[in-house]
């Protein structure tokens, strides 16, 4: 009997540490997906560095209470899977949202973004943001614009002076 309790404590500790360490977490209802569809989703998430696990709701509730995210308890009913990301805040939401568009059975229930409980709408809004690389390229183009404009203006002045001198 105590062996089963010890095993459950280990699982609760594992879930607790994943909630603490993750930058972004998404809880989904995967009821209605075939095994091949779940495998495809797992592969996409794994390629992005996201861990996708299924835990018992009672064990997840205990872990959620330990990390003081009790707002998630309302969403821990039925078959749930949890996607944890330690690296990219946007990746799990983006991948799951894209997958849900082509697989209606997959339903986003809630999420945790940087330690705060997020609603379905917030998770979907996060999914619509560009990736980190996309944001960096946008920032770079904004930073380059004044320099580019100055270079073009300088070139135009040089061309004008050259025409006047010729």
Swiss-Prot record:
UniProt entry keywords in alphabetical sequence: Ribonucleoprotein, Ribosomal protein, RNA-binding, rRNA-binding
Summary of subunit composition and partner proteins: Part of the ribosomal stalk of the 50S ribosomal subunit. The N-terminus interacts with L11 and the large rRNA to form the base of the stalk. The C-terminus forms an elongated spine to which L12 dimers bind in a sequential fashion forming a multimeric L10(L12)X complex.
Listed NCBIfam families: PRK00099.1-1
Classification via Gene3D superfamilies: 3.30.70.1730, 6.10.250.290
The protein's name: Large ribosomal subunit protein uL10
Gene Ontology CC: large ribosomal subunit
Family note: Belongs to the universal ribosomal protein uL10 family.
Biological processes annotated in GO: translation
Its biological purpose: Forms part of the ribosomal stalk, playing a central role in the interaction of the ribosome with GTP-bound translation factors.
Alphabetical list of SUPFAM superfamilies matching this protein: Ribosomal protein L10-like
Pfam family name, one: Ribosomal_L10
One MF term in the entry's GO annotations: large ribosomal subunit rRNA binding
Domain of life of the source: Bacteria
């Amino acid at each position: 009997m105590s062996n089963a309790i010890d095993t459950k404590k280990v699982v609760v500790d594992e879930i607790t540490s994943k909630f603490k360490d993750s930058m972004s977490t998404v809880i989904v209802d995967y009821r209605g997906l075939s095994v091949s569809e779940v495998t495809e989703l797992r592969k996409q998430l794994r390629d992005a560095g996201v861990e996708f696990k299924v835990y018992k709701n009672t064990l997840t509730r205990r872990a959620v209470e330990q990390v003081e995210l009790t707002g998630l308890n309302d969403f821990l009913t039925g078959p749930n899977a949890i996607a944890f990301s330690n690296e990219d805040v946007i990746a799990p939401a983006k991948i799951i949202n894209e997958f849900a568009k082509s697989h209606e059975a997959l339903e986003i229930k809630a999420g945790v973004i940087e330690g705060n409980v997020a609603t379905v709408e917030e998770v979907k809004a996060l999914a619509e943001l560009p990736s980190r690389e996309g944001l960096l390229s946008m920032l770079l183009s904004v930073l380059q614009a004044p320099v580019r404009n100055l270079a073009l203006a300088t070139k135009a002045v040089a061309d004008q002076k050259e025409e006047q001198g010729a």
